[in-house]
Amino acid sequence: MAKPSLSEYLRDHLDDISKKREPGPYLTISRQYGCEGFELGQYMLEKLNERDEERRWKMYYKELLKQLAEDTGLTQEIIERERLSKPSLVKDFLRGLKKSHIPDGYEIRNKITLMVRTIAFEGYAVIVGQGGAAATSDIDNGLSVRIEAPRDWRIARISIREKIDKAAAGAMIEEVEEKRKYLRKLYEEQNPREPAFSLVFDNSIFKKEQIAELIMQAMEQKGLIPPAKI
């Protein structure tokens, strides 16, 4: 029996979600390029499921882009490129002439936002990236976390991880941050809340294990997870 797609899963659970009185719990993790956002998400998933006897927590990262790729018959690379792209009259005109089935950036971002909101409302979700904080800014019973670090620290980490020199690592950071600039502006407009995140950590000072411990304490104090058993 084929495993249901994320879209099918969400559709199948819409009735259950509509009956749910309270959203969450959920956690969103935003990160600067070069920080341990993905690794932190994996570690948090492990720690959260240690607190949950039913091990209901799941992590969502590239799964959303993968699902949209499967739904549209496109590659994840095309979906990601369009998600980051700015509106273009010429591109939209050509898209209309070709009757292109490729969704534009606006459609892709809206679909991802809907997925994120649905997942967060259903609860027991660790959402890494994908504009999670902006998409869930008005949904209760969640915590939004941001991981940052000085540029030099991120350059050193990328240099080691990718086995490249620091100049190349710096160029990678510039390229990624330039691509994300437009997306970040849209997220700021979508979520004008100040501060934008519940917690912000300096990854150069706190390791992922230390950050996770602080997040667990915060989630416990907010009633999102049960106290640790003694």
What are these regions (language model features)?
Residues 1-102, 110, 114, 118-124, ...:
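Glycine-rich phosphate-binding loop of ATP-dependent small-molecule kinases
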Residues 60, 146, 203-204:
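Small/polar loops that bind or transfer phosphate-bearing groups
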Residues 65, 132-134, 148-154, 206-207:
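Conserved nucleotide-binding/hydrolysis micro-motifs of P-loop NTPases
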Residues 102-106, 179:
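Short, flexible loop segments at the rims of nucleotide/cofactor-binding pockets, characterized by
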Residues 125-129:
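Structural recognition of the conserved hydrophobic beta-strand(s) that form the central parallel beta-sheet
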